[in-house]
Amino acid sequence: PCIEDRIIQQCILQILEPICEAKFYEKSYGFRPNRSAENAIAESVRLMQRSHMQYVVDVDIKGFFDNVNHRKLLRQLWTLGITDTKLIQVIKQMLKAPVLLPDGTVEYPQKGTPQGGILSPLLANVVLNELDWWIASQWHLQWKVMKKPPQMQIRKSGVRDLAHEYRDLRTTNLKEMYIVRYADDFKIFCKTRSDANKIKFATTQWLNHRLKLEVSENKTGITNLKRKYSEFLGFKLKLREKSNKNVAKTKMCDKARLRAKEKLKEQIKAIQKPENDMQLFTRICKYNSTVIGIQNYYCIATHIFEDFREI
C-alpha cells in the first residue's frame, strides 16, 4: 500500500485493536500486544507436561491470507462490536482495492487480505478467533454446578491440585482438548489418538463450512509427542520420560537450523572479502546482530546448546 493508505490503515488499527483485543481468546499469541512466539511455546510446553497432552493435531490452512472470505470477515467484525457502518464500508473498500501485478495487469480481489497491509494481521486474528472459541467451547469452557463440591486434593509438594478439582466439574461428554495459536499456525492438544482423530475431522469440516477455508491434507496430521517431534514456530517439541514424569524436550527445527547455517555462512564469506575497512566493520556488526537474534529467539529451547554447537 502507498503511504496514504498506510496512514489510514494505522488509524483504523488504533481504533479496532482495543475493541477486538477484549474479545480475543487468551491462547492466541500472534500479532497481539505483549504476546510473542515465546508465550505460545511456553503454553505448549505447559500443556505437554502438566496437562499430559500426548497427542497434537497439526492443521495447515491452504493459503490462509489469500483465501479469507470477505463477507464472513465483515460479519465477524460486526459480531465483535464494530457496528459503525461507515467504518465497515471503508474496510470493505480496502479488501476490494485493485492490485497492480508485475506484468501490468490489474486484479480485483474477491477474497483474501492485502499483502503487507497494516490491518491484515488483525483481520487474520478476527477470522480465526471464532475457531479459538469453538475449540474452547468443546472442553475448556464447559462447567456445571455440582450439589456436592469436589473433594480437595493436595499434591506431594503441599500445593492444592486444582487440575483434578476442575476435572470433576466438567459437564461435557466431549473430550479434553486445548488450542494454542500463533496467527494461522496452530496446534490442538489431546490426550488420546481417538480424540485427536475426532477433532482433526471436526476441525477440517468446521473450517471448510464455517470459514470457507480449505485444509491441506498433506500437511495436516496427528503426532504422538512421545514418539516423534512436532514442529511449531521454528521449534521441535517432544515428550520424554524422566523420573516417571513426562518432560518436554524442545529444539530448533531442522529447516530453521539449516537456514541459520546458510545465512551465517554467506555473511562470513562477505566478511572475508571486504572492499574497505568501513565495509568490514559493517559486515561484522551485521553478523553479530544475526547471531544475537538467533540466540534471543531460540534460547527458550531446552536443548538449544546442541543446535548451537552444530551451527
Where are these regions (language model features)?
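Structural motif
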Residues: P1-I7, T85-K86, P114, I118, ...
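Glycine/proline-rich, flexible active-site/cofactor-binding loop segments
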Residues: P1-Y25
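Duplex nucleic acid-engaging cores and interfaces of nucleic-acid transaction enzymes
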Residues: I3-C11, A37, I41, Y55
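Short helix-capping/linker segments at secondary-structure and domain boundaries
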Residues: L16-K23, D132-W133, C299-T302
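Conserved polymerase palm-domain catalytic core
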Residues: K23-K27, R32, N39-E217, I222-L225, ...
